[in-house]
Amino acid sequence: MVSRNIESTSKVPTFHVIREVYDSSNAHERFEAELDKALEAKLDFIVIEPPRLGDETGRWIWVGNCLHKTAVATGVVSLVASLLWRDRPIIAAPACALSIFCTGLYTVSWNYDPCCQYQVENNDTVLEKLPLTDVSSPVILGYSPNSKTKYLHRSVSLLSAALCAWQIWRSYNRFVHSAGSG
């Protein structure tokens, strides 16, 4: 997605470099504040020189991506299991529970964090277009709006929860009616 933004538009990408300059004892806090400002500005690229901040940010994004993908994948597994084995909610329910858990955790921890709209940029063609000549081993974040993926993520989880709840309710009613007639 980030690649398309640079190639399809003629505008020069906006970027900010967080330099690794330790001029005080609270340099790391200053780096974090600078990163927060850059994230809020929704720049096309953020170049992070300080290795500790770059690693922490990269891991935070990775965990958010993992939660998002796990929620979608387990939601789809739950939907498919609910459709294939209509009378066995025991198969779909654990996948649905994991999907709902991951969606909830993502919503609480990542949804309102501006960092969730960035991805670690590894595409060489995109990186070549950035002026990175005087930067040493940076982590580069590329802006990638994710509102559509968040809606997909939530929709899959909620649909799987609704289908799973209906399946459990239907199985419960069958059990009650079969126990009452016997």
UniProtKB/Swiss-Prot annotation:
The chain crosses the membrane at residues 70-89, 91-108. The keyword RNA-binding does not apply. GO terms for biological process: inner mitochondrial membrane organization; mitochondrion organization. Keywords: Membrane, Mitochondrion, Mitochondrion inner membrane, Phosphoprotein, Transmembrane, Transmembrane helix. InterPro entries: TMEM11. GO terms for cellular component: mitochondrial inner membrane. It is a multi-pass membrane protein. Belongs to the TMEM11 family. This is Transmembrane protein 11 homolog, mitochondrial. It comes from Drosophila melanogaster (Fruit fly). The gene is Pmi.
